[in-house]
Amino acid sequence: MANEQNEQAQDIQNEQVEQSNEQTQAEGVEQANDVTVESLQAQITKLEENLKLEKARTANAVYEAQKSVERIQRESEKHKETVLEKFAKELLDSVDNLERAIQAAGDEETPVLEGVKLTLKSLLTTLEKFGVVEADTQNGFNADLHQAVGIDPNAKANEIGTVLQKGYTLNGRLLRPAMVMVGQ
């Protein structure tokens, strides 16, 4: 009987220990849950901040890339214009030489002269395709388009009397001024 009472006492004590352990575990789980939720919320907040930062960096990188592309395109266009301008200026010497050859040939039409005229016409057509056109010398002297190199006594004031060398523009910009004699 004493053994039975000891066993019952021990069973009661074991139950109390188990209940105490369960209670402690439950409290620990609740605390763990509280800590876990708080730490997870902190992690979420931190990750959201990192995401915002990375989005801003990405947007900035995209913006910088677009600006670089635009800058490169502008520089490329400017370089293309510069190269075209240099090339056109060099071709104008050939145009001048062909015009001098036609003037030197006189009035007699020969097959060679006809060939030179066709070559000049072809060259001028090609130049026009790329925006090179002859500067206007019919509407009076314009300091933006013409370079006065002398006075023509037969011309009226501010009128162009003689054109010594034709001028040309490239896409509206002066490529070479016309060398002219102007009236007084």
From Swiss-Prot:
InterPro entries per record: GrpE, GrpE_coiled_coil, GrpE_head
Pfam family, one: GrpE
Annotated region (Disordered), positions in chain: 1-34
UniProt keyword terms in alphabetical order: Chaperone, Cytoplasm, Stress response
PROSITE patterns, A to Z: GRPE (PS01071)
Record keyword Chaperone present: yes
Cellular component annotations (GO), alphabetically ordered: cytosol
GO biological process, one term: protein folding
Extent of Polar residues compositional bias: 1-26
Location within or outside the cell: Cytoplasm
UniProt main location, coarse: cytoplasm
Gene Ontology MF annotations: adenyl-nucleotide exchange factor activity; protein homodimerization activity; protein-folding chaperone binding; unfolded protein binding
Its job: Participates actively in the response to hyperosmotic and heat shock by preventing the aggregation of stress-denatured proteins, in association with DnaK and GrpE. It is the nucleotide exchange factor for DnaK and may function as a thermosensor. Unfolded proteins bind initially to DnaJ; upon interaction with the DnaJ-bound protein, DnaK hydrolyzes its bound ATP, resulting in the formation of a stable complex. GrpE releases ADP from DnaK; ATP binding to DnaK triggers the release of the substrate protein, thus completing the reaction cycle.
Family as reported in the entry's similarity comment: Belongs to the GrpE family.
Oligomeric and partner information: Homodimer.
Protein name: Protein GrpE
Organism listed in the record: Acinetobacter baumannii (strain ATCC 17978 / DSM 105126 / CIP 53.77 / LMG 1025 / NCDC KC755 / 5377)
